[in-house]
Amino acid sequence: MDMIGIIFILYLAFLLGVGVWTFKFNKTQEDYLLAGRKLGPWVTAFSERASGESAWLLLALPGAAITIGLSESWAVIGIIFGIIASWFLIAERLREETEKYDALTIPEYLHRKFNDSSNIIRLFSSVIIAFFFLFYVSAQFHASGKVLNSLFDLDPITGISMGAAIIIIYTLMGGFYAVAWTDLLQGILMIGTLVILPIAGYIELSESGMTISDSLAAANSVFKNNNSSFFGGKDGFAALITALGGLSWGLGYLGQPHLVIRYMAIRSSKDVKVARKIAIAWALPGITGAFLVGLVALVYFGPEYFLTVDPEQSMPILAKSLLHPVLAGLFISGAVAAMMSTADSQLLVSTSAVTEDFYHQYLGKDLSQEVLVKLSRIMIVVLGLAAYGIAIFSEIQGKKIFGVVSYAWSGLGSAFGPALVMALWWKKTTRKGIIAGLLVGFLTTIIWANIPALKALVTERLSSFIFAFLAVYIVSLQTQNES
């Protein structure tokens, strides 16, 4: 086994060790799901960033930069502004509100704030979270197969199986304590990858005389996507839709349950201001760096190379080609870190939706804290295996990580984003308005994503968010008698 493989295995052993070490800290359901609301600003910020930027950032975004080109830069801009908006609009108020209502989850917070005696908010929220997170977690498992295929030349199915097993085991053992503290290290590895790899690539390219502009021009004829155009070769209204489609990635940050739960777990609302600065400082070079990794790989290998090699494997391939094996091993571990950080967080949030919101609260099962924690661990295995099955299916069908993540991101962001923003900032928001927003965001995403004519017109990330926001607003105005 080479040096890269040794470093990778040592890193995975470390993750499992953290899971064993943090097992003893989980005495209550609040400990298991929110780390007892005791996280400091640095851990919170890095955990939010590491779990927010999944394998999508280190695998799918570079792949999109290669095959789509400069028009994907709108997504980079949208993501950065979405992160900033989430920290300013959601973080501090949500931390205060969830403690005020003694809520461990987003469904529970919305239920208690709007005094939903019907339990419809809790039920709808739980279904939405469980449904879309199965796809989202499956994308992370799928990504593990791609990285391990690149690293060890393993069959992708074997890689998916290994990655899924590791994530399920250490999330099962450590809960949110394990997730948050490993996210701190993984966030450091990820930002190191996204800053150093493009710089190393640029130095290599400058010495060879190759340029990004020439490679983008060549990619135009290879991928047929007008790669050298910021608007994909379109003009007028079509160009505007292209830009808005990329920018719409930012809207999802307002409602991703696995991200906003970090705001709920921070030690105090005062720590939010410090964590916000750290997270934004991470995002600016991190998101931009991922896009540059794709462009550097395009120049270094040439567009034709990616007709036979998966563009979503460009980051690990580039790291192995340019860097010392020790550094390459760390950075490829960073790619797996990105996948694990998101998958473990999503497994926890999905589990909380089933055990805390549905079983404990909706069905009214009065269980001890010890039994609730055990039930949560059982659900992690069940949901993890379901996501594993979807990942295997995606690999067999040849689906891209980019598309699966976009679908789940849209569904979660549009269902919860408008509901959370309005609940935190608009006093006229009503219970029925929240229910309408959840339902419209959920259904619009599913319908829009599965009708090619609508999807070709505008992405579901934008349409579903707008319709859900309007639903909350209009229905709330029509039901002011209950506010």
Label each residue range with its predicted role.
Residues M1-S483:
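Membrane-embedded helix-loop-helix hairpins and adjacent transmembrane boundary segments
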